[in-house]
Amino acid sequence: MATELDKIFLILAIAEFIISMLGNVFIGLVNCSEGIKNQKVFSADFILTCLAISTIGQLLVILFDSFLVGLASHLYTTYRLGKTVIMLWHMTNHLTTWLATCLSIFYFFKIAHFPHSLFLWLRWRMNGMIVMLLILSLFLLIFDSLVLEIFIDISLNIIDKSNLTLYLDESKTLYDKLSILKTLLSLTSFIPFSLFLTSLLFLFLSLVRHTRNLKLSSLGSRDSSTEAHRRAMKMVMSFLFLFIVHFFSLQVANWIFFMLWNNKCIKFVMLALNAFPSCHSFILILGNSKLQQTAVRLLWHLRNYTKTPNPLPL
């Protein structure tokens, strides 16, 4: 029987799902149609499309996971179901995180301006570097999956009531193993987080410096450029804030989920964890002129369609 808290959790989870699906499906359709029409795919559009597809997959897993937690949390102790859901969530989250990291690095080298020779050298090799990062992410995904499989096996044994004797006899050994495995998972997730954080912070600093230079110039024609840079800074900080919330929620989830799997607070951790895949698509739409213009045209057509009176039947 679902409690009032479970109902609130499910309503918020469904709202996050619908909002994010609209944004990511829109990004995927616009970029695919543009690629087919132009017979050419740009690097940013390719990464954006892959990010949208991986996020859609993650959202489907999140929705199923939310219903499982909200309506039948006891099924998490079912070995095959619990393991399958956790592994699918981890794989889709891994791909989404790394693609978002590659996108932030791409925008950093594309937009930022630094005279340092290392920056110029890396910018010249930007496409190759992103390919290498994606290959690295696949190797880390394999490693993480192996570690996570062992982690799940031990954790499900601990929370399974049928293994109470095992839990009492070997609890210290099992918790020591879990601590090591959780540390490994945290370290591998810290790699994309550090790259994401570094690239966006340097991009923000570059935008701040460029905006300051525009303010110091007395040219009135620079006002629109200054405003554009201010909007870009706000979007960068919003994207960064969402990713930081996602990262720290992931660390909290790794450390407490299997210990407090039936606790009500885990539901709020899940909502915070899902904020990044649920909201980042709209930040990307606002930050991309092509997507923004297409969205404005779509909203304008929808507005006109709803205002058009239907003909009366004869």
Curated annotation (Swiss-Prot):
Sample GO molecular function, one term: G protein-coupled receptor activity
Residues with attached carbohydrate: 163
UniProt keyword Glycoprotein present: yes
Transmembrane residue ranges: 8-28, 51-71, 102-122, 128-148, 188-208, 239-259, 266-286
Segments on the Extracellular side according to the record's topology features: 1-7, 72-101, 149-187, 260-265
InterPro entries membership: GPCR_Rhodpsn_7TM, TAS2R
Pfam families reported in the protein's UniProt record: TAS2R (PF05296)
Annotated keywords: G-protein coupled receptor, Glycoprotein, Membrane, Receptor, Sensory transduction, Taste, Transducer, Transmembrane, Transmembrane helix
Cytoplasmic topological intervals: 29-50, 123-127, 209-238, 287-314
Topology class, membrane: Multi-pass membrane protein
CDD domains (UniProt xref): 7tm_TAS2R42
Disulfide feature: none
GO cellular component: membrane; plasma membrane
Subcellular location: Membrane
A biological process from GO: sensory perception of taste
Keyword match Heme: no
Family: Belongs to the G-protein coupled receptor T2R family.
Task performed by this protein: Receptor that may play a role in the perception of bitterness and is gustducin-linked. May play a role in sensing the chemical composition of the gastrointestinal content. The activity of this receptor may stimulate alpha gustducin, mediate PLC-beta-2 activation and lead to the gating of TRPM5.
Leftover remarks: Most taste cells may be activated by a limited number of bitter compounds; individual taste cells can discriminate among bitter stimuli.
Protein name: Taste receptor type 2 member 42
Organism expressing this protein natively: Homo sapiens (Human)
